[in-house]
Amino acid sequence: MSDAPVDVVTRADGSLVLQPHGAIGPDDAVALRQVLVHAVRHVRPLRLILDLHDVSELDPINLGTLAAACGLGDDHHVAVFVDGSSIRIADQLTAAGVPQQRLRQITEPSPALSAPSPR
């Protein structure tokens, strides 16, 4: 995420969409947490959608941050959803405490990426 910032888009229906990119590691934890807290506490959109379609990796700190964002959203009456994650990241988010009903549009890995390489 350090190389590419989080894109923020406001939809006509009142949803705020956050789109991080690439591998999100420990160096990105503070920035991601600040964006999420600002969105939930100050912007207070109808819905906060974390679009992870372009995220290849989430470290444990940021997995916990996304799980905590769901609880923070509940406290502030903001529905938080996670869209477009890979199956692997969706499983990690579920293990970190993100309720299954918050995960939408889970994507299959590309066949080229999941196929064993020829020898």
In which residue ranges do the predicted regions lie?
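STAS-like cytosolic regulatory interaction modules
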Residues: 1-57, 61, 67-119
